[in-house]
Amino acid sequence: MRRLWPLALGSAIIIAVLAPLLLTNLILARGDMFLYFYPYWDARADALRELRLPLWTPELFMGAPFLANPQSGVLYPLNWPLTPFDAPLAVKISLGLHALLAWAGTYAYTRGRLALTSAGAGLAATTFALGGYVLAQAEHINQFQALAWLPWLLYAAGLPGRSALQRAGLTGLVLALAGCAAPPAADTSASTA
């Protein structure tokens, strides 16, 4: 139980900071989120609810390739449980969960690999997960999702007590998850940041 308190604290901080978005009927309603990502998320959810592989969508942009566009998020496993929700609510849930994922990864990396104190690791985690570098991508949800994996990438790459092959496998898994969340350019920025 004692090991869970940092995660509980991180959750409380994220909820407190993001409450105006997460706990109200407000939505992100400008730019790419409103005009691009909400329609994509709705089209993806419709296809997955119908158990249909969304190769093409005639409803968006006078027709567009869908599965071939990594920004659709079809192949990202953490998007699949969000299928029952409309796009604005699904995005809110994803933002909250990925902020927590970024917080937990930063905490694990700074506590386990950099040997910071619990307080130091918590401060580092809060600074990363709720700082400008990550939150600036909130309107580009796929890039936000990919960036949440960055601290886990650092953690996996240097995991003590594991063979080089195990570290490479874990690092590859984390990169694959980030790559399924966002197009290659965003994945590259996450892995080189």
Which residues fall in each region the model found?
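Membrane-embedded helix bundles of polyisoprenyl
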Residues: 10-13, 103-113, 118-193
